[in-house]
Amino acid sequence: MASVQDIGLSAAINLLSAFAFLFAFAMLRLQPVNDRVYFPKWYLKGIRGSPTRSRGIMTRFVNLDWTTYVKFLNWMPAALQMPEPELIEHAGLDSAVYIRIYLLGLKMFVPITLLAFGVLVPVNWTGETLENIDDLTFSNVDKLSISNVPPGSPRFWAHITMTYVITFWTCYILYMEYKAVANMRLRHLAAESRRPDQLTVLVRNVPPDPDESVNEHVEHFFCVNHPDHYLCHQVVYNANDLAKLVAQRKAMQNWLTYYENKFERKPSSRPTTKTGYGGFWGTTVDAIDFYTSKMDILAEQEAVEREKIMNDPKAIMPAAFVSFRSRWGTAVCAQTQQCHNPTIWLTEWAPEPRDVFWDNLAIPYVELSIRRLLTTVALFFLIFCFMIPIAFVQSLANLEGIQKVLPFLKPVIEMKTVKSVIQGFLPGIALKIFLIILPTILMTMSQIEGYTSLSYLDRRSAEKYFWFIIVNVFLGSIITGTAFQQLKSFLEQPPTEIPKTVGVSIPMKATFFITYIMVDGWAGIAAEILRVVPLVIFHLKNTFLVKTEQDRQQAMDPGHLDFATSEPRIQFYFLLGLVYAAVAPILLPFIIVFFAFAYVVFRHQVINVYDQKYESGARYWPDVHRRLIICLIISQLLMMGLLSTKKFAKVTALLLPQPILTFWFYRYCAGRFESAFSKFPLQEAMVKDTLEKATEPNLNLKEYLKDAYVHPVFKGNDFDRPRVVDEEESNPLVRTKRTSQGTTRYNSEASSSATTTPVANNDSPRCWGTKIGSFGCVIVVSYSC
């Protein structure tokens, strides 16, 4: 078991690493040549200009103003000065609420830490139990935990009381935060400027119709069922193959630019490359001519694929983005069932255009359930197969236990320096390496499930990552570490003593998690602000690919908050804090340092660096709240299991109401606040519509929305929001091919070969009829009389 010296060595290594990263960042950010790496957000907003312009050769690369080096740490107070309303306007509500999670950790754990150190640490330290257990490995750190309290001792009343205090305080803080974030979201939606997703719904599983194409069928359905609010629609094309060609052509363009720049710098000889994969083997050819011909071939293939998509009816998917004249009409459509058959004409709020994950719109709806079932099974096996490397990592953290099984390693293990490095540093860094490859796997699994927005993919990946951390990193570290450490004791002692050994050993894993917090939460956060990889990539691109100022702008990689990995990682720290607050309070100060340090770092990154891929209006908060409740319930269950091994089982029954009350609290919060994150109140929608009509009476919504949800490959390089045109276009009658079946006396007088449906001209007289549509839906048909 890691001792105080081991933890001290680990703390020294990680603190030195963190300070080294911070010092390097403070120096690098001051250099003009790195300005686009450490302040890209201001460049994207057009506020900041390049400091390398109008300077001498030396000052373009190095900052020679010594006064700036004196204030090299001024980025910290600057990160804290921007008020929250300004932060929301500058970076978006998603980023502002994400920062609040770190602040939530401080609000929750600072009072708990003070109380735990004032009450539980003296109770645990004076227990004097570990010395009386034979063949048990422990250190002075473990004497601060509940393991040092003798079984059946009345001292456990302090721990039981503390668990109730932690539960009520945590629930209070979570309630206040949920309420605050819900109000922030409602204010954000009320004050938000017009966006295409406010007026658009995504319609999926459009049923086939023998008389009409998908395009006509969608238009008919919404003209009839939403006659006063339907405006226009955009059907979804399967353009995945075309998107791959566009990506290949972009990659070829980068290589062509590289060789053209190389030729400009050295015009005496033309650059060459090889025709094999990556240019490493094959016939040597002229590089510029080779990539130019590649570009021409891909351009021809793109043109053929575009023509195929536009002319092939099979390329049109049974889905569409349908836009409405008002937010009120959009809310009604998005939040109601469109047909008596609940499996067709499925509507949901459309993600904003940059949030759409276009690849998954081409997946047939009937495949989604099968895909999600298979993904769930695959996730189950992934979680439990990952226990193998986790067990190996834990073996590194329990070398004393290995000595009992592999005594020939004892001479090496007993070397003081080797032992301290391995136990205090290696387990945390090894576990971190294993976890690096995991997010990519989980995101791929979420994409296979078929979700249609980047924000929802992040939320689903975060859910998978959270459960992976719970099972493998937390429970796996405790179970495998405990079993390996006490293997010999388990084989020699009576079966009735095994629960006692497990109960005593679980708190002793706090030392491992302390090392992990220092590696991931201290040094890892400091490495985040240094941005080593974006720094190197920017300078490589700037050297070999940049020809114009626009190229230099594209070479910047501002990055973004990766909710799929960062959220579960934060919640893991919440779990550790809640579990060990009443078990081993020594862990709490390390968690507080993490939350405080991460709050400053990520606030700086959000203000100066990150450019989010989408804005969901903090729609992920119910997931954050739910997972924190799960962490709280896990801590309660583990505390009950732990006390049941301490000859305190009868009194432990007093803890049974805790998880029940916590679940009731979760249900109450869900009923009270969750609708604010999934539905748009009709009252608020009407208010925004009324204000918009009063302030912009001539707004042409159809022009504003017509290109908003066109696949980006059909837009070229322009994926910006379409401009607002103030001149209203006329809306002609829509000619259809629908023939009447089961007609009434009104529509029997209408022409059966071709009918028209008024879309916008509400003054035209109408005749109404019904048609038995696909899957038995009765569709009312409107005709010009």
Curated annotation (Swiss-Prot):
It catalyses: Ca(2+)(in) = Ca(2+)(out). One of its GO terms (molecular function) is calcium-activated cation channel activity. Phosphorylated and activated by BIK1. The keyword Lipoprotein does not apply. InterPro entries: Csc1-like (IPR045122), CSC1/OSCA1-like_7TM (IPR003864), CSC1/OSCA1-like_cyt (IPR027815), Csc1/OSCA1-like_N (IPR032880). Pfam families: PHM7_cyt, RSN1_7TM, RSN1_TM. Keywords: Calcium, Immunity, Innate immunity, Ion channel, Ion transport, Membrane, Phosphoprotein, Plant defense, Transmembrane, Transmembrane helix, Transport. Residues 739-761 have a biased composition (Polar residues). It is a multi-pass membrane protein. GO terms for cellular component: membrane. The modification Phosphoserine is found at residue 54. The chain crosses the membrane at residues 7-27, 101-121, 156-176, 373-393, 425-445, 465-485, 510-530, 582-602, 628-648, 651-671. Coiled coil: none annotated. It is found in: Membrane. Residues 725-761 are annotated as: Disordered. Belongs to the CSC1 (TC 1.A.17) family. Calcium-permeable channel involved in plant stomatal immunity. This is Hyperosmolality-gated Ca2+ permeable channel 1.7. It comes from Arabidopsis thaliana (Mouse-ear cress).
